[in-house]
Amino acid sequence: MVIIMDEKAKLMRCIIERILDEYNKGKTLDKKRIEQIKAECLRIHRIGIGHPSNSEILQYATEEEKKILIPILRKKPVRTISGVAVVAVMTSPEKCPHGKCIFCPGGVGSVFGDVPQSYTGREPATMRGLMFNFDPYLQTKARIEQLEKVGHPTNKIELIIMGGTFPARDIEYQDWFIKRCLDAMNGVDASSLEEAQKINETAEHRCVALCIETRPDYCGEKEINQMLKLGATRVELGVQTIYNEILEFCKRGHTVEDTIKATQLLKDSGLKVSYHLMPGMPGSDMEMDKKMFKEIFENPDFKPDMVKIYPCLVIEGTELYEMWKRGEYKPYREEEAIEIISYAKSIMPKWVRTSRIQRDIPATVIVDGVKKSNLGELVYKYMEKHGIKCKCIRCREVGHVMYKKGIMPDIEHIKLCREEYEASGGTEIFLSYEDVKNDILIAFLRLREPYKPFRKEIDDNTMLVRQLHVCGQEKPLTKDLKEITWQHKGYGRKLLEEAERIAKEEFGKKKILVTSGIGVREYYRKLGYERVGAYMGKYLE
C-alpha cells in the first residue's frame, strides 16, 4: 500500500529529517538554528503557511524520533529545569476574610470583574481559571496537556494552589478542590480525597509537591493540620514586610508576630516555608527594605526556605491608586527595585531559594511601578555588571547553571556539604551534594530538630526531613529519554542515609519523619519508610 502524504506532512517530515541529520552529525541545534531549518524547508515546500510550531512538528514524529526531538524542541526548559513540572491552579473568587489591602487589585466586584483576590484576571493562571470557570479538574488537565504539547515530561508535578487564602475556604471546598486536581492527574474519578491520594501514589502524573498560599494569621494549628491532610509540602506566606506600622497602614490584617508564630509552627510540622515579600510598600524606603531583607535572612525568628520578591505596584481600582493620584505615594523606579533586589540576592544564605522575582501581572494594567515582566533578568544583569554573586539555591542549581551558563558539573569535585543554623527555636541542618569547584548544587536535604511541635506524630525522639530534592531537568519515571540528568543517580538516597545517621548518632533520636509529596511515598517505601500519620516515617535502630 502506498501512503500519499499531504503537503503539510511533507513539510513537517522535511524539518524533522533535517533536525535529526544535524543532531547525528553533532551540530549545534539552538532555537535560532531550528528556526533556520524551518525557513529552509518552507522554501522547498511552498504551501502558504508560516513557521510551524514545535508542538505541530512533534505530531509528525515517530515515538523513536520524539526521544531525540523533545529535548531539542522543548520550549522554555526552565519550566522543568528544577526537576518538576509546575501546574498552577486557581481557586474561584471569594472575598478575603480580613477585608482588602490598599494595594490589592482583585476580588469579588473589582474593576476587573469577579476575579481571585490580589489578581487582575490578566495573569496566565487566572485566565486559565476563567476559561474553565475555575474548575480544578479542567484547569489541571489543560495545563498538563499544554506542558506535554511543548515537550515537557509531566511525570512529576508540583501543584500550586493560587487565588487567595485557601485555608480560609470551607473545608469541604478545600477537600473537593484538591481531590479534583488529583483526579485530573490520575485519569480516574475517585470516591474520596483519600482514595485520590492513594491512586496518585503510583499514577502516571504524580503530585510530588503541593504548595498552598495563605496569610500568617490563617496558619495556626487547625489550618496546618488541614494542609497536611491535603498533602501539602510547602506553604507560601503573604508576609509582605516585617514592619508592623506598614502592615497596619496597608490594612494587611496581620502582624509580624503572626508571621513569626506561623513560621515556627510550619517548620515544626515539617513543612517548607516560603515568604512573599513586597519592597516599596507605603511608609517604607530603600534603607528600610534593605534592613528588612537582612533581618529576614539573619534573625532566627524568620529564616524562610524560599522567597518571592515583587515590588509594590499601583493598579487601578485600589486604595493605593487613589493615594497615587493625590501624590501621596510613589512606587520604586525600575533602577531602585533592581538595586534593592540585587542587595537581597547578595546576602541570601545558600539554603534559601529565590522562587520568583516580580508578579505575573501584564504591564498594560500597571499604572505606575516596575512594568517589566523580566525584572529578574535585569537584576541578574545588574549583578553581573557589578560583580555581585548570589549563593541562593536557584542560582546554583545544576539545571539552571547548565542551561544559563553552559557549565557541566565536575563529578570528581562533587562532595557532601553541611551547613547548620538555628531557626524558629529549632536546629536546621542543610545537607547537600555540590560540585565545590564550580559551586553547583546537585541535591539537598533539610533536616530539623523541632522546637515546640504540636503534631502527635512528632515527639522528643523525632527529627524531621522537611525537604529532599535532587535538582536538574525532570527525568521521567520511565527510562526512555536519554538526557543529561542528575535525578535517579542515588544522591537522594545518600542524603537520606546521612540524615538518618545525624539524627541517631549526633542527636540521639529514635525516629525520623519525612514530609513526603503524595507521589513520592513509593520512593520512601522502597527505602524502608512507612506511613506515620501525615508523614513517611522510619524507626532508627
From Swiss-Prot:
Binding site for acetyl-CoA: 156, 467-470, 491-493, 524
InterPro entries: Acyl_CoA_acyltransferase, Aldolase_TIM, ELP3, ELP3-like, ELP3-like_N, Elp3/MiaA/NifB-like_rSAM, GNAT_dom, Radical_SAM_C
Lineage top rank: taxon: Archaea
EC number: 2.3.1.311
GO biological process, one term: tRNA wobble base 5-methoxycarbonylmethyl-2-thiouridinylation
Keywords: 4Fe-4S, Acyltransferase, Iron, Iron-sulfur, Metal-binding, RNA-binding, S-adenosyl-L-methionine, Transferase, tRNA processing, tRNA-binding
Biological source species: Methanocaldococcus jannaschii (strain ATCC 43067 / DSM 2661 / JAL-1 / JCM 10045 / NBRC 100440) (Methanococcus jannaschii)
Main enzyme class: transferase
Pathway recorded for this protein: tRNA modification
Molecular function in Gene Ontology: 4 iron, 4 sulfur cluster binding; metal ion binding; tRNA binding; tRNA uridine(34) acetyltransferase activity
Region (Radical S-adenosyl-L-methionine (rSAM)): 76-336
Known role: tRNA uridine(34) acetyltransferase, which mediates formation of carboxymethyluridine in the wobble base at position 34 in tRNAs. The proposed mechanism is the following: (i) recruits S-adenosyl-L-methionine and cleaves it to generate a 5'-deoxyadenosine radical (5'-dA) in the radical S-adenosyl-L-methionine (rSAM) region, (ii) hydrolyzes acetyl-CoA in the N-acetyltransferase domain and (iii) an acetyl radical is formed by the products of the two domains and (iv) is transferred onto the C5 position of uridine(34) in the bound tRNA molecule.
PANTHER family in UniProt: HISTONE ACETYLTRANSFERASE-RELATED, TRNA URIDINE(34) ACETYLTRANSFERASE
CDD domains listed in its UniProt record: Radical_SAM
Cofactor(s) recorded in Swiss-Prot or TrEMBL: [4Fe-4S] cluster
Family membership noted in the UniProt record: Belongs to the ELP3 family.
Record-annotated Radical SAM core domain positions: 79-350
Protein name (record): tRNA uridine(34) acetyltransferase
N-acetyltransferase domain mapped to chain residues: 401-541
Keyword hit for Oxidoreductase: no
PROSITE patterns: GNAT, RADICAL_SAM
Record text on cofactor binding: Binds 1 [4Fe-4S] cluster. The cluster is coordinated with 3 cysteines and an exchangeable S-adenosyl-L-methionine.
Binding site for [4Fe-4S] cluster: 96, 101, 104
A GO CC annotation given for this chain: cytoplasm
Reaction(s) catalysed by this chain's protein: uridine(34) in tRNA + acetyl-CoA + S-adenosyl-L-methionine + H2O = 5-(carboxymethyl)uridine(34) in tRNA + 5'-deoxyadenosine + L-methionine + CoA + 2 H(+)
Keyword tRNA-binding appears in the UniProt entry: yes
